[in-house]
Amino acid sequence: MHATVFGNTQIQKDPTNNAIPHKLIERLTGLKRNQDIYNYQVSHIWGHTKNPFFFEAPWNICCTPKLMDPFTGHESKGICPEEYQKIFFAKAYSLYAPFLEDYESMIQDYDMENQIKRYVQSLRGRKEERVLNQFERDALSEWKSI
């Protein structure tokens, strides 16, 4: 899809799904996990980890104390996590608004929703319908507005 939409054939999958964000934090801060900082985990603020613009974006990556994981994890449920996440996302949005606005402009300029639908349509008859439908749902979710 990225080759079709963006003309980019150089996107590679992170083998651990977190090695690149860890290296990015280390490069930007000079701090190494389990050497300079302990009991923290590298997390994606808004998720969208299958979207290359979000996966490596410094404004979507943070170090979170492991103690806070019950409040920040995507599987967290309940009133306390909901309240914490509301405050956390509001603060993150206020810090990174210019970058998020750039992203919003980009997905509008590229008309990502229609690009995804056209790409999936181009594969109809060559791929299993069930697989295409799941891919379309996942891609639309990954490329949606924040």
Feature names for model-found ranges:
Residues 1-32:
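Short, charged surface segments at domain edges that flank catalytic/cofactor-binding sites
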Residues 2, 21-28, 84-85, 116-119, ...:
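Generic structural signal of hydrophobic/aromatic residues within well-ordered alpha-helices
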Residues 23-63, 69-77:
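Histidine-centered nuclease catalytic patch
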Residues 51, 65, 81-85, 125-133, ...:
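Short, structured coil/loop segments at alpha-helix boundaries
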Residues 54-55, 71-115:
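Polybasic, low-complexity binding patches
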